[in-house]
């Protein structure tokens, strides 16, 4: 999948997935389309965008706020927020232009305890940290190498959440588990980055 971030004023992108687009333009199914906001729009423009999204029946064009992205990037204190960030197609990873994320997946089983998940997250984080050292890309511009060396983004994803008694609920216990798991990933990454002689991931 790809993501397309367009200007708010781009009417062609606004309606790219309206009507029966899949009959005449089936390749559009491969991209998620969003408007990239660089400032707060006035209410009339904002409502027009929402109305267009509703009428498209496709859930697009979505909304991506670059100002909010900069604030989020600055939260950890490890990441330089002075970029016009984009995002991956699912919208959970902030990316520089020519940026990438080293993804690993944790499979959650229904009976997993917090300790079980900590161990799985640890292994996934170690794998992602090692993967981030593979930064000498051939056949692409050097900026890809530079960004990977500087940021070493990790994505420790979890699948099977809805099968789990604790994590499938919107509860304070689930929130606490997720906070602990993320903190553990950050700690493990810092330890292994030091062992490998590389910088810590700026975001996990």
List each language-model region with its residue ranges.
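Internal maturation/activation junctions in enzymes
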Residues: 1-40, 132-145, 149, 153, ...
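Exposed alpha-helical structural elements
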Residues: 45, 49, 102, 116-119, ...
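Function-dense linear segments that define catalytic or interfacial modules
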Residues: 55-168
